[in-house]
Design a protein with these regions (language model features):
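Membrane-embedded transmembrane alpha-helical bundles that form the catalytic cores
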Residues: 1-527
């Protein structure tokens, strides 16, 4: 039962809404928790035990850290400044050990389930004989969403340790934060402070929230079923049989995958955020017109925003203020100059971020390469920044002009397409093969000689994708210029507004990729 399924949208959600509204206000959060666990069980069965275990551990660590903080406050009463400092340091060490224990257990479970086979296979190749053979049962499955709720759990415990939030005292509230059903499969990866204000209120359903929620859900379905599922046919054909293709066909498939991935992932986010909106719950946005980005750094501030924000908060910032970086900054300012100091500092802080980004996506070398690809590009951007600024000034080029911005956006599109080619490829070796064949054997004639019609899509399919992309692009452009489309629609006359709503639904029914020749496509990010 995916978010795009008929069962979810027309059965699970309405039943949940009905029971939620009937329940007393103080019990509505527990109703959502019950439906969340039912949803997870329908997806992963007995693997629900992993989510329950993570919830129990996270809650206990949060309480433990709170107890340590209370003990610290009591211990420093009446002490002098030096004594207070010594006592606080001792309790901070206790807190760090407790936090480290929680993180170690969570990452240990995730690593064992998701990465154990990857490490054993590569170690076996390295040493020339089987390593740790039989340590992992063959039928051991990975629960859906574990990569998402593990990060949320680590973020929650860390925020409690930092003192930025208070630990929950009622375990059902911790459980709902980690397991709220709309976000369990694909995120967004919310911080506790992002959702706490609306997650537990239990307020009654409101007409405006229900309408806005379902409109957003159907907008997500449009992107997923009309565009992404259609592009998947061509993309899967080329990437699964990459040795049979070259040149422009590979380029077209890489571009197609960028379209597929964005339309599916952002479409699912629309469904997820819309599902939360039905109950008056505000989940964080995960996309902000990423294809308007002028460089890789900006792209990642607009793409999968909550993942980037998590890495920034819990890896980048802690490394940036670490003792190693502080010592380097002191040394670098004296001996190496401002630019080199900044370059090395950025490298130290960004390297673990991009390693983690690659590894988080999956246990394959092409995902690790994908992370390093963006790390290198971002570091190159920082390295050449003084030279670039000098050239712009010498040539009297205003970087804010539309022409220059268009060039930068086009350059970023090329970077994105190449990166996603390796991301989608069936392994790093396959990615290199496809990339080399795309460059060496490029033939633009393949785009017009009918070759593209042999990849599973007909002319009408490509036309539907193009029109769909134009519609999504226009809406995105309006949002980029500060126009809130849904609010603008609310200003329209009721017949016009509801006419547009029904047009969206009819468009999905007519143009969605289903029926003969089409296969139901699994959610891409649910596999991570």
């Amino acid at each position: 039962m995916g978010y795009h399924s008929i069962i979810y949208i027309f059965l699970f959600l309405p039943v949940c809404l009905f029971v939620y509204q009937l329940a007393p206000e103080k019990w509505r959060g527990r109703v959502l928790l019950g439906f969340s666990w039912i949803f997870f069980y329908l997806l992963s069965g007995k693997l629900l035990v992993y989510l329950l275990g993570t919830t129990l551990l996270t809650h206990c660590i949060g309480i433990w850290l709170t107890v340590i903080r209370m003990q610290e406050a009591k211990a420093v009463e009446g002490l002098e400044r030096k004594q207070k400092k010594a006592v606080k340091m001792e309790y901070q060490k206790k807190g760090r050990r407790v936090l480290a224990l929680g993180i170690f257990i969570l990452l240990g479970i995730l690593g064992y389930l998701k990465y154990f086979d990857f490490f054993t296979v590569n170690l076996s190749h390295l040493f020339g004989h089987p390593v740790l053979e039989g340590w992992r049962p063959e039928n051991l499955l990975m629960p859906i969403g574990i990569s998402f709720y593990t990060l949320q759990a680590i973020g929650y415990m860390t925020d409690v340790y930092w003192g930025t939030i208070q630990a929950e005292t009622e375990i059902w509230r911790t459980a709902l934060f980690l397991g709220f059903f709309p976000q369990i499969m694909e995120g967004p990866i919310a911080r506790y402070s992002d959702v706490a204000d609306t997650l537990y209120t239990g307020k009654s359903l409101e007409y405006r929230n229900v309408v806005d929620g379902y409109v957003r859900i159907f907008w997500g379905l449009f992107k997923k079923m009309v565009i992404a599922d259609r592009m998947a046919l061509m993309v899967n054909q080329v990437f699964d049989h990459y040795a049979d293709y070259h040149g422009a066909v590979i380029l077209a498939a890489a571009i197609g995958y960028v379209i597929q991935l964005y339309m599916e992932f952002s479409g699912c986010m629309d469904i997820i955020i819309g599902s939360g909106k039905l109950f008056g719950i505000c989940l964080p946005e995960n996309f902000r017109q990423p294809f308007c980005a002028k460089n890789p750094s900006e792209f990642w501030r607009r793409w999968h925003i909550t993942l980037g924000a998590w890495f920034k908060a819990y890896i980048f910032y802690p490394v940036s203020v670490s003792g190693l970086v502080k010592k380097w900054n002191q040394y670098g300012r004296k001996h190496c100059g401002k630019h080199i100091t900044r370059l090395v500092t950025s490298a130290i802080a960004l390297f673990p971020v991009w390693v983690a980004n690659g590894v988080w996506h999956g246990a394959q070398w092409n995902y690790i390469f994908y992370g390093m690809y963006y790390f290198v590009l971002i570091m190159l951007g920082i390295a050449v920044e003084p030279v670039r600024d000098c050239i712009l000034e010498t040539c009297h080029i205003n970087p804010e002009t539309r022409v220059w911005r268009t060039i930068q956006i086009a350059k970023t599109w090329v970077i994105i397409v190449v990166g996603e080619l390796f991301f989608r490829a069936n392994g790093l070796k396959a990615g290199w093969y496809m990339f080399c064949n795309m460059i060496k054997r490029f033939d633009a004639g393949q785009l017009t000689d009918g070759t593209l019609y042999t990849l599973g899509l007909e002319r009408a399919d490509y036309l539907a994708v193009i029109v769909g992309c134009l519609i999504v692009g226009i809406v995105g452009s309006m949002k980029e210029h500060g126009i809130h489309v849904q609010k603008k629609m609310e200003e329209l006359a009721v017949p016009v507004r509801w006419g547009l709503y029904y047009a969206l639904i009819i468009g999905i029914l007519i143009f969605a990729a289903y029926g003969d020749g089409y296969q139901i496509q699994d959610l891409i990010y649910a596999g991570f």
